């Protein structure tokens, strides 16, 4: 009978994730916002900060780099941080200027559709919102593409007023959508040219 040989046991590792860049703290240096990550980690956990960014840890990593490479890495990190800050600022500006468009279009003489555009820019999952509208109004509701290639929610029926009210009340999937950035549009169906009587 062979006896059970115990080899090296594996230890389960629980990584500490950064709330700024969502990477494990060891990889924050490769993310776009190193200084924010450092400040957050120093606030949250001093021991982890010392392990990752302390003098000993930095000296062991930088010890193998030449002075030129070290300066280049610092310059690249500063560039990345500026770029990430500009990108975040541009997104915030775009979000601020974007309007939520609620269109009412005519399908037939008495049937209408309501189209909602630009909800995804405010962090709304369009499929969840479409399902919420279908349940609320007991009608068909789906996500479809516009001719411009953007996604919109199409709801069967004239429910524009109710949707505006749901956005104001921040119901379900519509949490975080600003009620002051709503634009209502009425799209009339083009009438076919009548043929002259002979």
From Swiss-Prot:
GO terms for molecular function: mRNA binding; translation initiation factor activity. Pfam families: DENR_N, SUI1. GO terms for cellular component: cytoplasm; ribonucleoprotein complex; ribosome. One of its GO terms (biological process) is translation reinitiation. It is found in: Cytoplasm. PROSITE patterns: SUI1 (PS50296). Signal peptide: none annotated. It comes from the Eukaryota. The keyword Cytoplasm applies. Keywords: Cytoplasm, Ribonucleoprotein, Ribosomal protein. Residues 100-171 form the SUI1 domain. Interacts with the 40S ribosomal subunit. Belongs to the DENR family. The SUI1 domain may be involved in RNA binding. This is Translation machinery-associated protein 22. It comes from Cryptococcus neoformans var. neoformans serotype D (strain B-3501A) (Filobasidiella neoformans). The gene is TMA22.
